[in-house]
């Protein structure tokens, strides 16, 4: 059972073009609809 692989079922926020690795979220609120965890949704 590998948690790292399980997380890839979700669209990986970390591979999203707007992902901010420092804040661990995406820079724009509208990225909600693109499958990225936004900084302020």
UniProtKB/Swiss-Prot annotation:
* Major localization class: secreted
Processing after translation: Contains 3 disulfide bonds. They are not added, since framework IV presents two different connectivities (I-V, II-III, IV-VI and I-III, II-V, IV-VI).
The record places propeptide residues at 1-24
Q: In which tissues is it expressed?
A: Expressed by the venom duct.
Entry annotated with the keyword Secreted: yes
Q: Which GO terms describe its molecular function?
A: sodium channel regulator activity; toxin activity
The UniProt keywords, alphabetically, are: Cleavage on pair of basic residues, Disulfide bond, Ion channel impairing toxin, Neurotoxin, Secreted, Toxin, Voltage-gated sodium channel impairing toxin
Region forming the signal peptide: none
User: Where does the record place it?
Assistant: Secreted
This protein's GO CC annotations: extracellular region
Tell me where on the tree of life, at the top rank, the source sits.
Eukaryota
Domain remark from Swiss-Prot or TrEMBL: The cysteine framework is IV (CC-C-C-C-C).
User: Per its database record, what is this protein's job?
Assistant: Mu-conotoxins block voltage-gated sodium channels (Nav). Blocks reversibly sodium channels in molluskan neurons, but has no effect on sodium currents in bovine chromaffin cells or in rat brain synaptosomes. Induces paralysis in mollusks (C.retripictus).
What does the sequence similarity comment in the record state about its family? Belongs to the conotoxin M superfamily.
- The molecule here is called Mu-conotoxin pn4c
């Amino acid at each position: 059972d590998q948690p790292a692989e399980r997380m890839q079922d979700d669209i990986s926020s970390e591979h999203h073009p707007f992902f901010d690795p420092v804040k661990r979220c995406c820079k724009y609120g509208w990225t909600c609809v693109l499958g990225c965890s936004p900084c302020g949704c």
